[in-house]
Amino acid sequence: MSLLRVCCTAARGFASRRVFLESTMNTAGLRPAGYASGGVTKDKEPLKKAKTPQGRFDMEETESKSKDVLERFPDDVNPETKEKGGPRGPEPTRYGDWERKGRCIDF
Amino acid sequence: MAAVCAASRVLGTKILSCKSLPAVCQANRQLHFSIYGKRGDAKISDGVSNQYPVVDHEFDAVVVGAGGAGLRAAFGLSEAGFNTACVTKLFPTRSHTVAAQGGINAALGNMEQDDWRWHFYDTVKGSDWLGDQDAIHYMTEQAPAAVVELENFGMPFSRTDDGKIYQRAFGGQSLKFGKGGQAHRCCCVADRTGHSLLHTLYGRSLRYDTSYFVEYFALDLLMEDGECKGVIALCMEDGSIHRFRAKNTVIATGGYGRTFFSCTSAHTSTGDGNAMVTRAGLPCQDLEFVQFHPTGIYGAGCLITEGCRGEGGILINSEGERFMERYAPNAKDLASRDVVSRSMTIEIREGRGVGPDKDHVHLQLHHLPPQQLAARLPGISETAMIFAGVDVTKEPIPVLPTVHYNMGGIPTNYKGQVITYKDGQDHVVPGLYACGEAGCASVHGANRLGANSLLDLVVFGRACALTIAEIDTPGEKLSPLKPNAGEASVANLDKMRYANGSTRTSEIRLNMQKTMQSHAAVFRTGDVLKEGCVKMESVYKSMDDIKTFDRGIVWNTDLVETLELQNLMLNAVQTIVSAEARKESRGAHAREDFKDRVDEYDYSKPLQGQVKKPFEQHWRKHTLSYVDPETGKVTLEYRPVIDSSLDAEDCAAIPPAIRSY
């Protein structure tokens, strides 16, 4: 019976416990070294927002989009070849093989 | 609380039964799938083994593998009314087809005037006249219809301004039989044609009532009197054995890139179909033709585009020397792919490789201005950081020749039926079909053209379904099968599960991969290949001493990896022995000691006055390899190439000539 109880509590509490641990670890790691001693040490970097599941989804939409190296064409139409819905970025077959992000996909 | 207790009780009983009860009692536990609807005729039999529960299923057709070709065959059969099962070790959308992001060729004629006969010529020439012209005729003639059919299924091809499918120039395609300049035949879906193809086919297949058996590892074919009567498979989820009895079996299990140390294929490309056919005593065709790419990232296996060298990147050995200047003084790093691959391999063999094992070379890009690199090759710094862990503006990328595609496979005719060659004639094996990369129809011959393999998948997947619909009718009674059919496979499974030798599976696999990479890769000469054959024999024998650790039967990945290693071994020995025997250079099989093609006539000179060489003395023929699974000994036979197209008036066959681009 104790084995079963351990199993069921483990199964139920596992998900919530993992999130709990993650958030405490995050905040603990982010406190600067002299915090407990209460000295006048200034923070070298500003405190980051704890990445709780809710906080994670609050990231800016534009932030992730600008990191994409291959830009979308306006309306997905390639201005030179007038191809609709084609590959982004420069023409993939310009070197004789099918290139994307420096990788050769087909040759 | 009650629900939780009930759940934990079930959990508890499962835990207990796996540990304490003996194997025999597990036959009484609940099977993981509920038997309902058409699966109602699945019966548990104990004719095979009293240790392993074996479930028997009866279908009209079984398809092994659910990649592009497998899915097309499966729903083609369901559409024709057959009760079809699709047995796959991966979820359909995880098959390796999803990684094929290049385009698909078809002579639709949207960009300029085009004719499928010109596509036929290009493919025959690309295969170095080793492709069977009837199969190539079938594929290129069906290509436009196949692409339009895919588009009707919902595949979102990229479009021109007036709404037709946009085609671009790719893959050695020309107009007017090579005389009319570059042809634009390659259709694509943004950057992910293979991904989109697979998802389209999977979505379409759900309309029909194919029974999917996902995460079932096919062990062997059930052969009786030279006829294929089904497949025996291991359900990975609960460890039960299933026998799928069917009048028609279609093999679409993909290639075997994982026999080499560096390959672009997924870890699951282990040539299971080729091995199943070999164990059934049937031949595999042209396994020595393996397509390599010179610059694949060491360890990761993805390929770096030739554009890097085109923009000024150079290949460096351990001495910091730009070694391509020695091998190709004029073209240097821009020499053709096979020259570059061979030069890299020679440098590595002579000890000038880099890294702790000295088994690769460097591709240097940091001497180029970073803005130029980012402008001309956007995304390369990201690729290099993710896959090689290097900053491309400061360090070189480690590269080595990498396997990309296997042209060889299970020999079939143009209809997709598996054939054997006896007494000078092709004989069809009743009940067995093959398509996709696993099959060898042979459309790619000695070298595959870019964007032709996705076409191969859909055309021959459909061809298998059509042939079965032509020959067979749904609902036919199955011929009787011996009650102990599949016994040997289960015995082998049991042996591997309790294997207690001294070498682990991963060590033997690494030995095999390194041996194949250093002996059967791009650089092939007689001595190197012979040495490789001897080493592969000893690696094969070391399989007797294998050790596995997981003794369970539920989701035993150690066991499945060991079975996959057995399959890889059979493919590897056939590849290297066939390569050693073929004393010529043709397409992807290039030998240093026999640099020319050896055909029945010398096609570089006028044919008049030449004596035709007998079949035994020339090499324009298919290799058929058989293996004795006990000893690993390979026997080779040869089969002539089919030189006539399906309809000589409609499409004239192309007589052989010297291949030059």
UniProtKB/Swiss-Prot annotation, chain B:
Cofactor(s) demanded: FAD
Positions annotated to bind FAD: A66, A69, T88, K89, S95, T97, G102, A218, D272, E437, S453, L454
An MF annotation (GO) of this entry: succinate dehydrogenase (quinone) activity
Annotated catalysed reactions: a ubiquinone + succinate = a ubiquinol + fumarate; (R)-malate + a quinone = enol-oxaloacetate + a quinol; (S)-malate + a quinone = enol-oxaloacetate + a quinol
UniProt keywords, alphabetically: Electron transport, FAD, Flavoprotein, Membrane, Mitochondrion, Mitochondrion inner membrane, Oxidoreductase, Transit peptide, Transport, Tricarboxylic acid cycle
Any single GO CC term annotated in Swiss-Prot or TrEMBL for this entry: respiratory chain complex II (succinate dehydrogenase)
Location relative to the cell: Mitochondrion inner membrane
The enzyme's E.C. designation: 1.3.5.1, 1.1.5.-
Swiss-Prot/TrEMBL GO biological process terms: mitochondrial electron transport, succinate to ubiquinone; tricarboxylic acid cycle
Transit peptide: 1-39
Active site positions, chain numbering: R337 (proton acceptor)
Activity modulation notes: Enol-oxaloacetate inhibits the succinate dehydrogenase activity.
Keyword Oxidoreductase: yes
Family label: Belongs to the FAD-dependent oxidoreductase 2 family. FRD/SDH subfamily.
Summary of subunit composition and partner proteins: Component of complex II composed of four subunits: a flavoprotein (FP), an iron-sulfur protein (IP), and a cytochrome b composed of a large and a small subunit.
Described purpose of this protein according to its UniProt entry: Flavoprotein (FP) subunit of succinate dehydrogenase (SDH) that is involved in complex II of the mitochondrial electron transport chain and is responsible for transferring electrons from succinate to ubiquinone (coenzyme Q). SDH also oxidizes malate to the non-canonical enol form of oxaloacetate, enol-oxaloacetate. Enol-oxaloacetate, which is a potent inhibitor of the succinate dehydrogenase activity, is further isomerized into keto-oxaloacetate.
Protein name: Succinate dehydrogenase [ubiquinone] flavoprotein subunit, mitochondrial
Species in which this protein is naturally found: Danio rerio (Zebrafish)
Gene: sdha
